[in-house]
C-alpha cells in the first residue's frame, strides 16, 4: 500500500514537473518572439511616393514609423497631415513607411498622391505588409509603430504620442530605454 502511494506521488510529481517545464518553455518562446518582433518588419524593397522601387537601406540610422493607414479611414485622413508635418520637422532622423490598407495598389497610389505623402510605402497588400500587420497585432487604423535606429519596436502608441507631444515625441522616443 505504501509503495503504491509512493509511486502515485512520484507520478504526480513527474507530471507536475513536465507541466511546469512546458509552461516555462512557452513563456521563454513568447519572450524571445517579443524581443525579435522587429526583425523582418521592413522588406528590402519599398516604393517611393512616385511608385518607384527603392531600397530600404535609406532607412539606416533613422527612427522609423510604420504607418498603418488607408484612404477610406476618416481618422487616418485627419492624422496624415499631422504626421506629414511631424516628419518634415524631423526628416534628418525620422522616416515613415506606409503600410496601406487600401483594396488595390492603385487606391494606395491615389491616397499617397492626394495627400502628398513624402515617405516610402510597402507594396499594397503584399506578403510583407500583411506579415508586419500580423506580427505587430494591428487591430485598428491609424496605427503608428515606432522603431529605433536598430529596428527595435519602442512604441506602438505613435499616433497618440505625435498628437499629444507634438515635436517632443521624437525626444521621448530617443530617451526610451534601449533594453525595454
Q: Which ranges hold each PLM region?
A:
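Thioredoxin-like thiol-disulfide oxidoreductase module
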Residues: 103-140, 145-150
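Conserved redox-active cysteine motifs that mediate thiol-disulfide chemistry
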Residues: 68-85
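Thiol-/selenol-based redox modules, centered on thioredoxin-like
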Residues: 146-180
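Short pre-active-site segment immediately N-terminal to redox-active cysteine/selenocysteine motifs
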Residues: 62-64, 69-72, 140
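Sec-exported extracytoplasmic/periplasmic mature domains
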Residues: 78, 85-91, 113-117, 149-152
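Short beta-strand segments
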Residues: 97-99
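A short beta-strand-turn-helix
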Residues: 43-64
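N-terminal targeting signals for export/organelle localization
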Residues: 1-45, 180
